[in-house]
Amino acid sequence: MVWALPRTSSPSCIAPSYKPDSGWIKMSAEWLIDWSCLLNGLRDLIAGCIQAVRDCNSFALTTVICLLMLFAWYCYRVGKDQPRSPFATVNLLIQSSEAKGLQNGFAYCHSRECVRCTHNDGLNQKLYHNLQEYAKRYSWSGMGRIHKGIREQGRYLNNRPSIQKPEVFFLPDLPTMPYFPRDAQKHDVELLEQNFATILSEFEAIYKAFSNCSLPQGWKVNSTPSGEWFTFYLVNQGVTIPSNCKKCPRTYRLLGNLRTFIGNNVFGNACISVLTPGTVITEHYGPTNIRIRCHLGLRIPGNCELVVGGEPQCWAEGHCLLFDDSFLHTAFHEGSAEEGPRVIFMVDLWHPNVAAAERQALDSIFAPGR
């Protein structure tokens, strides 16, 4: 019996609909070569099985059957691990899975647009494709940690201690701590605190709308086990909200004067966050460790607390509190109704140990809409 792989159609008969990436062509060619070798191995196994039956050699037949079972399992693993096409967008990969509820005791929201709460197995392949595109256009210089982080993302996230486990992207070799000192981003902290009165006055103007309806235009309500948590975004996952910015023009202009505000990728946010009395935010992890989350206290009643990595801290009006939200964290307002809501202005700043070249690359890799 003669074995031969079937002939493929002539290349001239195929009209390509796109020009594929050379890296993907190389990956696909290597995959086809692997399968060609596997088919040759299958041919030899079947031939050995037939010969064993003819010779009535029970030991050889048992051995061949075991090898066939191992071969079938290996084929399943190869097929399962074959990367998906890199031409889908990051947003489609992130949004393709169903929004989650409460998992493993930690909170997930129900928004398909939320970067933290939606995942997809093809995300790392897409991120690597984005990194390759960026490096070809600019340079691989300074990309070592990002390359390492994307390449070994699964191992990093699976092996992280439960106290810190970012949901989407972990950049290796960053100094880590639940809370950061004010000097970590001194310029931006001082600028925010100097503009405390401005931000507070614009909040008070937009918060008056709550007296006329339960959820005024521009506000979002977040899922909590008790109480109510409202947010008013100026920038949501790297996307500016023009209608909201018009209502807080001076606060929005202030963002442009911050040196380390993450405004160009999906990990960057700026919003007013309101907790009503009796509210508890379920403990959860943020999406990445490349940022520092900054809370500027606007209205802080008693019995309000933030807990990050098991360490409690209290906000203070007119002062910034910096923390790494990739640590397990929660917040609550146990004050009375008479005390009113807890209000902070939240803004995401770059981790001080993320280099300028890395920031530029991460803005490209995690750009909104990619």
Curated annotation (Swiss-Prot):
Q: Which cofactor does it need?
A: Fe cation
Which Pfam families does the UniProt entry name for this protein? Answer: Asp_Arg_Hydrox
Q: What does this protein do?
A: May function as 2-oxoglutarate-dependent dioxygenase.
Can you provide one Gene Ontology molecular function annotated for this UniProt record? metal ion binding
**Membrane disposition:** Single-pass type II membrane protein
What does UniProt list as this organism's lineage?
A: Eukaryota, Metazoa, Chordata, Craniata, Vertebrata
Q: Which UniProt keywords apply?
A: Dioxygenase, Glycoprotein, Iron, Membrane, Metal-binding, Oxidoreductase, Signal-anchor, Transmembrane, Transmembrane helix
Q: Topology: which residues are Lumenal?
A: 79-370
Protein name in UniProt: Aspartate beta-hydroxylase domain-containing protein 2
GO CC aspect terms? membrane
Q: Which residues lie on this side of the membrane: Cytoplasmic?
A: 1-57
> Where are glycans found on this sequence?
212
The species this protein belongs to is Xenopus tropicalis (Western clawed frog)
Main subcellular localisation:
membrane
Give the binding site residues for 2-oxoglutarate: 229, 273, 293-295, 342
